[in-house]
């Protein structure tokens, strides 16, 4: 039960946050205008402490007052996920309602340094590390991205790949990490909160993925977490390309970004999250390159990189190829790191990524409340 002081503190905070907003705005994206306290996950985050990101979010969601002391907000469906889990079972009839909308997904607040190798402490807050338990310990050997409070997108080869030792068990996902060698990450007084280590409840690899397929078709998987991730400045979801425009875009002549710790099944490169900008490569050109080693690149894959030393070497196996929306600057995941040349970063040999847009129907079919 909340103490009177706690309730007054929360309500006072909200009144300050929303007082500049227009009351009575309509809700978009399947959200409902309800009292803040009924938007359970968001209310719990506010009780844990306010942040600039949470302030901006609440300002954008405010839609009126129940009474003088009860502000109402357009509660995004993802913040009702915990409550819904007890009232529904099985496949969700409207899976897109589980996905965060553009007021929540793909947003980062740092002043980014373009061309840098090391990320800022709160850059790409959707990046995830996959923890594997081994007979003699544990370690992080793949990556992924948070796409919803209870879902991480990764590569199928990270959960059933031919290089994955049978004695390893994927057990947890870590969110909110920046430097794996320190307990608390701080840069010039800006400190992240504690990391979120969340057990994996269910592993969902694409049914048509074959670990022994050298072309690595259908190399995509989802991880359902045992509980909701708590969104903050260092943990938030990336957007998925749900629109037909983004699903079908070839992105030729564009640059995208790969980030991660350089962790794969066979190497562990960096303690600190790294990034690199890579050019999108014409698929026909990419297919011609890989035909020299008898590998087939299809329209369900996307190629990027091919610059000496600047490939997905800095990304993680199962991590993301990311780009920003030209309309709203939100970040989207367009590719999942699948395979590339050996040695990594060989000039003229781009990395190959699973095209997320080609698997949106599959992703949506697997999402449950």
From Swiss-Prot:
Can you tell me which residues form the catalytic site? 157, 219, 317
Q: Where is this site: Cleavage?
A: 83-84, 112-113
- Its signal peptide is 1-24
The Enzyme Commission number assigned here is 3.4.21.-
The GO cellular component terms are: cytoplasm; extracellular region
Activity regulation text: Inhibited by (p-amidinophenyl) methanesulfonyl fluoride, p-nitrophenyl-p'-guanidinobenzoate, D-phenylalanyl-L-prolyl-L-arginyl chloromethane, leupeptin, antipain and to a lesser extent by antithrombin III.
Q: What class of enzyme is it?
A: hydrolase
Where does tissue-level expression of this protein occur? In larvae, expressed in the fat body and hemocytes.
Cross-referenced Pfam families: CLIP, Trypsin
- Glycosylated sites: 179
Q: Where would I find the Clip domain in this sequence?
A: 26-75
Q: Where is the Peptidase S1 domain?
A: 113-368
- Copy the domain comment: The clip domain consists of 35-55 residues which are 'knitted' together usually by 3 conserved disulfide bonds forming a clip-like compact structure.
Its family remark reads: Belongs to the peptidase S1 family. CLIP subfamily.
Q: Per its record, how is this protein called by name?
A: CLIP domain-containing serine protease HP8
């Amino acid at each position: 039960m909340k103490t009177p002081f706690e309730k007054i503190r929360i309500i006072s905070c909200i009144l300050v946050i929303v007082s500049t907003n227009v009351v009575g705005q309509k809700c978009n994206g399947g959200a409902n205008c309800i009292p803040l306290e009924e938007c359970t996950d968001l209310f719990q985050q506010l009780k844990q402490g306010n942040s600039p990101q949470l302030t901006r979010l609440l300002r954008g969601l405010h839609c009126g007052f129940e009474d003088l002391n009860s502000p109402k907000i357009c509660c995004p469906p993802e913040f009702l996920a915990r409550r819904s889990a007890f009232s529904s079972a099985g496949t969700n009839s409207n899976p897109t309602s589980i996905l965060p909308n553009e007021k929540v997904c793909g947003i980062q607040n740092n002043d980014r340094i373009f061309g840098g190798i090391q990320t800022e402490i709160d850059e790409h807050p959707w990046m995830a590390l996959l923890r594997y338990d081994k007979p003699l310990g544990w370690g992080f050997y793949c990556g992924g991205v948070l796409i919803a409070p209870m879902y991480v997108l990764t590569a199928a080869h990270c959960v059933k790949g031919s290089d994955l030792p049978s004695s390893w068990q994927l057990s947890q996902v870590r969110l909110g990490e920046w430097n794996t060698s320190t307990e608390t990450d701080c840069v010039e007084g800006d400190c992240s909160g504690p990391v979120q280590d969340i057990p994996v409840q269910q592993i969902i690899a694409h049914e048509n993925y074959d670990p022994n397929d050298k072309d690595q078709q259908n190399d995509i998987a989802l991880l359902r977490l045992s509980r909701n991730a708590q969104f903050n400045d260092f943990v938030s979801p990336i957007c998925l390309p749900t629109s037909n425009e983004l699903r079908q875009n070839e992105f030729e002549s564009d640059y995208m970004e790969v980030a991660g710790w350089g962790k794969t099944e066979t190497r562990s490169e960096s303690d600190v999250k790294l990034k690199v900008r890579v050019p999108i490569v014409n698929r026909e050109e990419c297919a011609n390159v890989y035909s020299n080693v008898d590998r087939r690149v299809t329209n369900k894959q996307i190629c990027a990189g091919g610059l000496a030393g600047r490939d997905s070497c800095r990304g993680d196996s199962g991590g993301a190829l990311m780009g920003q929306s030209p309309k709203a600057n939100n970040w989207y995941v367009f590719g999942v790191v699948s395979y590339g040349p050996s040695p990594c970063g060989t000039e003229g040999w781009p990395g190959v990524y699973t095209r997320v847009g080609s698997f949106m129907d599959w992703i949506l079919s697997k999402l449950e409340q």
